[in-house]
Amino acid sequence: PFAPGATPSGLPLNVLLAGAKAFGVPIVAAGGVSDAAAVTGALGRGASAVQVGTALLLADEAGTNPVHRRALRDEQFTDTVVTCAFSGRYARGLANDFTARYDPVAPLGYPEVNQMTGPIRAAVIAAGDPHGTNLWAGTAWRDISAGPAADIVAALAATH
């Protein structure tokens, strides 16, 4: 389970699903789900449903800012990191200069950290700089597509 002050385990979805089956409760799978094969795999391993987040970041209807959208397609970004540096609670995003510098010393403390970094993030977004703001993205960000959300969801559900 996710608790705001707990360091996320980093276990892959398939490992979490295998362990969760023992509890006999409905499980909503999330994390690393970016295509129909991942949906099929999660459902086949016992998930009752699948939730996506990153898969919709480039949807036409998403509120993803232009700096974030460009970064999701920019080859300079090669990895993700789980950090609390932007908001004071853990979330996964593209590794950038801000995470490299501040993640090692970032305190937990949402919403205070989020409020303190808000003006910084707004300024660097206005300047078009992807290295001073959060670029939320999951591990499968390279597999996501742009287009209408309905088309993205239809592609995810293609085999069901």
Regions found by a protein language model. Name each.
Residues 1-26, 34-160:
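Conserved active-site-proximal phosphate/metal-binding subdomains
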